[in-house]
């Protein structure tokens, strides 16, 4: 349970997850205005909500559960602002497999936040980017671990960076 097995979990929703990720990337990139910087609220989210890391090939268990708790607590105490939850995978595995795995990670984090009292209406979307946007490019286990993550960010953060 919680482990994604190729072939066993395949269905049309995998294709839908892939298409959704591509559509969101295109829509967000084209909707970018000329932002002058991030709001204080967006900066606070970036400074206080930490990345959540996952074991290899797992979407429903994290390396450090205290990070999920701390993030949820901070978000409850600071209830303003929309959120985007984005899952990622390390570069091993094929594109569709990693998109689905990263999507499930993002959905799991979203569910954990809501379970811990974060208002679900704040979360505009939770999606997976697979092996896109790697934070570490080396091919060792330590680097792979850094890429198996979920980020929680304010929408304007991504729009600001994509507009640069």
Annotate each language-model stretch with its function.
Residues 17-27:
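Bacterial N-terminal signal peptides
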Residues 24, 43-45, 76, 117, ...:
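Sterically constrained small-residue positions within well-ordered secondary structures
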Residues 89-161:
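Periplasmic OmpA-like peptidoglycan-binding domain that tethers envelope proteins to the cell wall
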Residues 4-18:
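Bacterial N-terminal signal peptides that target proteins for export
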Residues 31-81, 155-164:
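Periplasmic peptidoglycan-binding/tethering modules of Gram-negative envelope proteins
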Residues 82-88:
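Glycine- and acidic-rich phosphate- and metal-coordinating loops
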């Amino acid at each position: 349970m919680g482990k994604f097995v190729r072939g066993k979990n395949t269905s049309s929703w995998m294709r839908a997850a892939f298409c959704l990720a591509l559509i969101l990337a295109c829509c967000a990139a084209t909707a970018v205005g000329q932002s002058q910087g991030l709001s204080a609220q967006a900066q606070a989210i970036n400074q206080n909500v930490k990345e959540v890391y996952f074991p290899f090939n797992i979407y429903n268990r994290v390396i450090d559960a205290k990070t999920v708790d701390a993030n949820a607590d901070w978000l409850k105490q600071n209830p303003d602002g929309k959120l985007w939850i984005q899952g990622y995978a390390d570069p091993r595995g094929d594109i569709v497999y990693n998109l689905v795995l990263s999507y499930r990670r993002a959905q799991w984090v979203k569910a954990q936040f809501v379970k811990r009292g974060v208002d679900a209406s704040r979360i505009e979307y939770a999606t997976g980017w697979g092996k896109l946007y790697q934070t570490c490019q080396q091919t060792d286990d330590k680097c792979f671990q850094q890429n198996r993550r979920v980020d929680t960010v304010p929408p304007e953060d991504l729009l600001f960076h994509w507009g640069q």
